[in-house]
Amino acid sequence: LLLYALSEDPFFSKKDILLIEKESKNTNDRTWSFCEKKEGAFEELLEKKWDVATFLSSSVSLDFKLAPYQYKMLRSKGFYKACREKIESQKNIQYLSAEKTALKTEGNASKVITTEGTFSSKNVFNSVFDPTALYNQKKYPVLKQHFIGWFIKTKSEQFDPNKILFMDFNIEQKKETRFLYVLPLDSKNALVEYTLFSANLLEKKEYEEGIISYLKNQRITEYEIEEKEQGNIPMSSFPFDQFNTPSLLNIGTAGGWTKASTGFTFMNTSRNVSKVVSFLKTGKPLNHFNIKNRFWFYDLLFLDVLSKYNSQGSKLFE
């Protein structure tokens, strides 16, 4: 996202930019879903968007309109392709396939040490998440948004393509916060995810049994699994920005840009990228960049309650 934003701004057209990735990405290895007002930068790449959402629990059954927002799905394959085309079209952007082995700040520059050599810059942006510090502390509560999702195709029409099932808590909670999440692409195709906000991961079998059980309860028995995906996203208000330096800025999940109360990352990152682009034009040291606001504190409080009363998650979201 940051590379794309920099490439769109003429201010950076004469700046040398190097993108280092462990391997080139060209598949649907992830799906981003997010709320957004009006048309966004990736509107043409969207898989689908919706205007209505459903929330279900033992005591609540609610359809609600999202206006002035829309809920949008962006799949990674199209996004990666757009980024590759952007890199290839601009001479000031170079791509390197290499594995990062270390990051070091020395003087007024940071060094990226890779399997293909060492690179130094006064502005280094790191999106590789290192969980060590997060899980070695006790001050800030830590949960995970973890899930397995199936893209399925049913034999008959089963889904309302005009609305998403945002959260369905009408499944066995097992003393945790568990729900189903369904994004219908049309009346026969949908992404169905079994999701938890909890401290510990499950065996793969348990997520998939949860999906099978849910579909059976919805009387959906004839379907094909076309794709699978899984994820594990940290949820915490831990201050990752303490690891930034004058020449190094951690971004995305590595920078604490995931919304702590939900595990959503894409729109938070998109907003922060816009702020970074403006910030770079000031010439200030990167560790002066700050994203904290009152919502950071609200998320901290919410997550503290959710971690202590994880079995009551559905009541909190009601």
Name these PLM-found stretches.
Residues E36-A98, L103-N108:
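A conserved beta-strand/loop capping segment in the N-terminal third of enzymes
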Residues E47-W50, K175-T177, F243-N244:
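Short, flexible loop/turn motifs enriched in small residues
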